Amino acid sequence: MTDQENMKAAVPDAAKRYMRYLLIMAGLGGLLYGVDVGVIAAALPYIEQTAGFNPSQLSQVVAAVLFGSVLSSLFAGYLADKMGRKALITIAAALFTLSIPVICLSQEVFGIMLLGRILQGASAGIVGVVVPLYLAECLSAESRGKGTGMFQFLLTVGLVF
């Protein structure tokens, strides 16, 4: 094979690897979103038992993630244009990562628990806006359906588990 033929063969392989990478990242973004929103279902009985929150406070703990999601999704598109999609996805992952120790360390402190849940929601709102946007820009027309399907499938898996 000539060098030119080798280059032509390498480009499709590199493009395929990049598409696979994007599909995996789409799936992980969806999974992160699903876990952000759905993690409370498994944790709520434990929180109720150990933290001593009243029913109103427990409702607020559940709803706080939606509040954070609404707030961040209002600005996610604008921030994605200003900061870049990858940077904002990284920030969303960092917010989620930060929310875990905040929630774990909250013990019986209601306000800190709310802060952790709002951080989780902010992460979910960003992911819900920016990951599909990033996929639409990066995936070929033939792969966009796979990418958004993978995002939605793993989002649902994250909600359930």
Task: Describe each model-derived feature in a short phrase.
Residues 2-161:
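Transmembrane-helix signature of 12-pass secondary carriers
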